[in-house]
Amino acid sequence: MKQLYRLAALFLALLLLCGCVAGNGYGKPERKEGQDEYLTDPVPEGKPQPVEPQNVTVGDTEYTCTISISCASILEHMELCDKEKAELVPEDGWLLKPVEVTFQEGQSVFDVLQQVCRENKLHMEFSMTPIYNSAYIEGIGNLYEFDCGETSGWMYKVNDWFPNYGC
C-alpha cells in the first residue's frame, strides 16, 4: 500500500546531471559492499524498492502524477555543450514543463516517461540494460549523454529523491 501511495504522489523530474560507474579496468564494474546484484547502493529507509520488470502486473486502478523533463543544468554549462546540440537546449531549460498524467497501478517511471514522450511528440531513445535489468535513457529531445560534457547524462527524480536504479 505504501508503494501505491508513493506512486499516487509521484512527482517526477528528469534532469541532465552526471553519472559514473566504478570499474575494475576490464570493463566490468566492481561490486561494492552493500550493493545488490545490479551494483546499486541500498535503498534508503522509507523509499520504494525496485521491482523487477518481469514481476510486474499492471492493474486497472488509475493514479495521477506530475511529470516534467528538464535540462536546466545544461544552461549553467553551455560551454561544455556540443555546438550542434546547443540549439536544442530550450532557453528556459524545459523540454516538457510539469504536466499531470494518468497511469495504472504497476506501471513504472519508464512506462510513464514513454507515454508522455509519445503523447508530446518528444524524441526519446533508450536501451534495455540486461546487467541492471532496466531501461537506460540514452537521449531525450535529441540530447544524449556526453553531448554536454563527459559526465552528462539523464537521471530521474521521484518525490525529490534520485533512485540509484534504472527507471
Language model region names:
Residues 2-9, 18-167:
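Ubiquitin-like/PB1-type beta-grasp interaction modules and other compact soluble beta-rich domains
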